Amino acid sequence: VRVDNPIQNYTVSPMRKNIKANVSGNQLSFAVDSAAYLLVKINDLEDLYLLINPKVDYQAQVSDKEIVNILSFGIDSTGTNKETEKIQAAIDEVSRRKAVLYFPKGKYYTGELYMRSDMTVLLADDALIMGSTDPADYQDKSLIRMDGVSNFRMLGYGTIDGAGWAGLRKNGAREFHLLYASNCKNVLYDGVVLRDPTFWNTR
Protein backbone atom coordinates (compact mmCIF):
# COMPACT_ATOMS: atom_id res chain seq x y z
CA VAL A 1 0.00 0.00 0.00
CA ARG A 2 1.51 3.33 -1.06
CA VAL A 3 0.45 6.71 0.36
CA ASP A 4 1.56 10.29 -0.31
CA ASN A 5 3.54 10.92 2.89
CA PRO A 6 5.91 8.85 5.04
CA ILE A 7 4.11 6.27 7.17
CA GLN A 8 4.29 7.14 10.87
CA ASN A 9 1.90 4.52 12.23
CA TYR A 10 -0.34 1.76 10.94
CA THR A 11 -2.48 -1.22 11.93
CA VAL A 12 -3.64 -4.24 9.96
CA SER A 13 -6.79 -5.79 11.43
CA PRO A 14 -8.09 -8.18 12.58
CA MET A 15 -5.24 -8.18 15.06
CA ARG A 16 -5.73 -11.90 15.81
CA LYS A 17 -4.22 -12.69 12.40
CA ASN A 18 -0.95 -11.15 13.60
CA ILE A 19 -0.03 -9.97 10.09
CA LYS A 20 3.55 -8.74 9.94
CA ALA A 21 4.07 -5.67 7.76
CA ASN A 22 7.11 -3.77 6.57
CA VAL A 23 7.34 0.00 6.20
CA SER A 24 9.62 1.67 3.69
CA GLY A 25 9.06 5.41 3.52
CA ASN A 26 5.53 5.85 2.22
CA GLN A 27 4.94 2.17 1.41
CA LEU A 28 3.43 -0.57 3.58
CA SER A 29 3.81 -4.16 2.44
CA PHE A 30 2.62 -7.47 3.86
CA ALA A 31 1.65 -10.92 2.65
CA VAL A 32 -1.36 -13.14 3.31
CA ASP A 33 -1.62 -16.83 2.56
CA SER A 34 -5.38 -17.24 2.56
CA ALA A 35 -8.64 -15.42 1.92
CA ALA A 36 -9.23 -12.55 4.34
CA TYR A 37 -11.16 -9.35 4.95
CA LEU A 38 -8.70 -6.80 6.29
CA LEU A 39 -8.85 -3.26 7.61
CA VAL A 40 -5.69 -1.19 7.10
CA LYS A 41 -5.20 2.09 8.96
CA ILE A 42 -2.27 4.34 8.01
CA ASN A 43 -1.48 7.65 9.73
CA ASP A 44 -4.72 9.64 9.90
CA LEU A 45 -5.93 8.62 6.45
CA GLU A 46 -9.28 7.06 5.58
CA ASP A 47 -9.64 3.38 6.38
CA LEU A 48 -8.69 0.94 3.64
CA TYR A 49 -10.72 -2.27 3.41
CA LEU A 50 -9.14 -5.19 1.57
CA LEU A 51 -11.43 -8.06 0.58
CA ILE A 52 -9.16 -10.92 -0.45
CA ASN A 53 -10.99 -13.89 -1.93
CA PRO A 54 -9.65 -17.23 -3.15
CA LYS A 55 -8.74 -17.29 -6.83
CA VAL A 56 -11.55 -18.93 -8.79
CA ASP A 57 -11.06 -20.83 -12.03
CA TYR A 58 -13.99 -19.41 -13.97
CA GLN A 59 -12.91 -21.16 -17.16
CA ALA A 60 -13.47 -24.49 -15.42
CA GLN A 61 -16.97 -23.39 -14.40
CA VAL A 62 -18.00 -23.02 -18.05
CA SER A 63 -15.98 -25.87 -19.55
CA ASP A 64 -19.15 -27.85 -20.30
CA LYS A 65 -20.66 -25.00 -22.35
CA GLU A 66 -20.14 -23.70 -25.86
CA ILE A 67 -17.74 -20.75 -25.62
CA VAL A 68 -18.07 -17.99 -28.22
CA ASN A 69 -15.24 -15.45 -28.53
CA ILE A 70 -16.52 -11.88 -28.88
CA LEU A 71 -13.79 -11.22 -31.46
CA SER A 72 -15.51 -13.63 -33.85
CA PHE A 73 -18.10 -10.88 -34.38
CA GLY A 74 -15.50 -8.53 -35.85
CA ILE A 75 -15.31 -6.36 -32.76
CA ASP A 76 -12.46 -3.92 -32.08
CA SER A 77 -10.63 -4.79 -28.85
CA THR A 78 -8.40 -1.70 -28.70
CA GLY A 79 -11.05 0.71 -27.43
CA THR A 80 -10.72 2.85 -30.55
CA ASN A 81 -14.17 2.22 -32.04
CA LYS A 82 -17.55 2.28 -30.35
CA GLU A 83 -18.92 -1.24 -30.81
CA THR A 84 -22.34 -1.13 -29.15
CA GLU A 85 -24.33 -2.65 -32.01
CA LYS A 86 -21.87 -5.48 -32.64
CA ILE A 87 -21.56 -6.36 -28.97
CA GLN A 88 -25.35 -6.34 -28.59
CA ALA A 89 -25.68 -8.62 -31.62
CA ALA A 90 -23.17 -11.00 -30.01
CA ILE A 91 -25.13 -10.99 -26.73
CA ASP A 92 -28.38 -11.75 -28.54
CA GLU A 93 -26.84 -14.58 -30.56
CA VAL A 94 -25.10 -16.21 -27.60
CA SER A 95 -28.31 -16.05 -25.58
CA ARG A 96 -30.13 -17.82 -28.41
CA ARG A 97 -27.46 -20.54 -28.32
CA LYS A 98 -27.51 -20.73 -24.48
CA ALA A 99 -23.75 -20.39 -24.58
CA VAL A 100 -20.87 -18.41 -23.05
CA LEU A 101 -19.74 -15.07 -24.50
CA TYR A 102 -16.01 -14.69 -23.85
CA PHE A 103 -14.21 -11.32 -23.78
CA PRO A 104 -10.44 -11.89 -24.07
CA LYS A 105 -7.85 -9.32 -22.99
CA GLY A 106 -8.66 -5.94 -24.52
CA LYS A 107 -10.71 -2.76 -24.25
CA TYR A 108 -14.29 -2.80 -25.54
CA TYR A 109 -15.81 0.66 -25.98
CA THR A 110 -19.61 0.66 -25.91
CA GLY A 111 -22.85 2.36 -25.06
CA GLU A 112 -25.77 0.70 -23.27
CA LEU A 113 -25.89 -3.10 -23.43
CA TYR A 114 -28.93 -5.28 -22.73
CA MET A 115 -28.14 -8.64 -21.16
CA ARG A 116 -30.30 -11.63 -22.10
CA SER A 117 -31.47 -14.84 -20.44
CA ASP A 118 -29.83 -18.27 -20.57
CA MET A 119 -26.24 -17.15 -21.09
CA THR A 120 -22.93 -16.47 -19.38
CA VAL A 121 -20.56 -13.57 -20.00
CA LEU A 122 -16.95 -14.44 -19.14
CA LEU A 123 -14.37 -11.64 -18.84
CA ALA A 124 -10.66 -12.38 -19.04
CA ASP A 125 -8.45 -10.87 -16.32
CA ASP A 126 -7.42 -7.94 -18.54
CA ALA A 127 -10.74 -7.44 -20.32
CA LEU A 128 -12.25 -3.96 -19.92
CA ILE A 129 -15.78 -3.04 -21.00
CA MET A 130 -15.51 0.74 -21.18
CA GLY A 131 -18.64 2.87 -21.25
CA SER A 132 -19.09 5.67 -23.76
CA THR A 133 -18.83 9.26 -22.50
CA ASP A 134 -21.78 10.35 -24.69
CA PRO A 135 -25.09 10.44 -22.76
CA ALA A 136 -26.96 9.84 -26.03
CA ASP A 137 -25.59 6.28 -26.04
CA TYR A 138 -27.71 5.35 -23.01
CA GLN A 139 -31.39 5.20 -23.94
CA ASP A 140 -32.34 3.72 -20.56
CA LYS A 141 -29.59 5.42 -18.53
CA SER A 142 -27.51 2.36 -17.74
CA LEU A 143 -24.38 0.71 -19.12
CA ILE A 144 -25.41 -2.87 -18.28
CA ARG A 145 -29.19 -3.36 -18.36
CA MET A 146 -31.21 -6.40 -17.35
CA ASP A 147 -35.00 -6.38 -17.64
CA GLY A 148 -36.80 -9.67 -16.92
CA VAL A 149 -33.59 -11.67 -17.35
CA SER A 150 -33.23 -15.18 -15.91
CA ASN A 151 -30.43 -17.76 -15.77
CA PHE A 152 -27.66 -15.25 -16.41
CA ARG A 153 -24.07 -15.15 -15.12
CA MET A 154 -21.24 -12.68 -15.53
CA LEU A 155 -17.95 -14.16 -14.36
CA GLY A 156 -14.24 -13.40 -14.39
CA TYR A 157 -11.72 -10.89 -13.14
CA GLY A 158 -12.30 -8.29 -15.83
CA THR A 159 -13.66 -4.77 -15.32
CA ILE A 160 -16.75 -2.82 -16.35
CA ASP A 161 -16.13 0.95 -16.28
CA GLY A 162 -19.11 3.31 -16.20
CA ALA A 163 -17.06 6.30 -17.46
CA GLY A 164 -18.57 8.55 -14.79
CA TRP A 165 -15.57 10.69 -13.91
CA ALA A 166 -13.94 9.72 -17.20
CA GLY A 167 -16.29 12.10 -19.02
CA LEU A 168 -19.95 11.07 -18.77
CA ARG A 169 -20.67 13.40 -15.84
CA LYS A 170 -18.90 16.29 -17.53
CA ASN A 171 -21.06 15.73 -20.61
CA GLY A 172 -24.30 16.12 -18.66
CA ALA A 173 -25.23 12.58 -17.60
CA ARG A 174 -27.29 12.50 -14.41
CA GLU A 175 -28.53 9.56 -12.34
CA PHE A 176 -27.21 6.90 -14.70
CA HIS A 177 -26.68 3.32 -13.50
CA LEU A 178 -23.61 1.23 -14.16
CA LEU A 179 -25.66 -1.94 -13.64
CA TYR A 180 -29.46 -2.00 -13.53
CA ALA A 181 -31.59 -5.11 -12.96
CA SER A 182 -35.38 -5.34 -12.79
CA ASN A 183 -37.65 -8.41 -12.42
CA CYS A 184 -34.74 -10.82 -12.80
CA LYS A 185 -34.12 -14.25 -11.29
CA ASN A 186 -31.17 -16.62 -10.98
CA VAL A 187 -28.60 -13.92 -11.80
CA LEU A 188 -24.97 -14.10 -10.64
CA TYR A 189 -22.11 -11.60 -10.90
CA ASP A 190 -18.85 -12.96 -9.52
CA GLY A 191 -15.30 -11.64 -9.67
CA VAL A 192 -16.06 -8.72 -11.99
CA VAL A 193 -15.03 -5.21 -10.93
CA LEU A 194 -17.72 -2.54 -11.43
CA ARG A 195 -16.14 0.93 -11.28
CA ASP A 196 -16.71 4.64 -11.94
CA PRO A 197 -20.50 4.90 -12.14
CA THR A 198 -22.11 8.23 -12.95
CA PHE A 199 -24.46 7.87 -9.98
CA TRP A 200 -25.66 4.41 -8.88
CA ASN A 201 -23.22 1.55 -9.24
CA THR A 202 -25.76 -1.27 -8.91
CA ARG A 203 -29.51 -1.00 -8.69
PLM-predicted stretches and their roles:
Residues 1-203:
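Extracellular/periplasmic carbohydrate-active domains that bind, remodel
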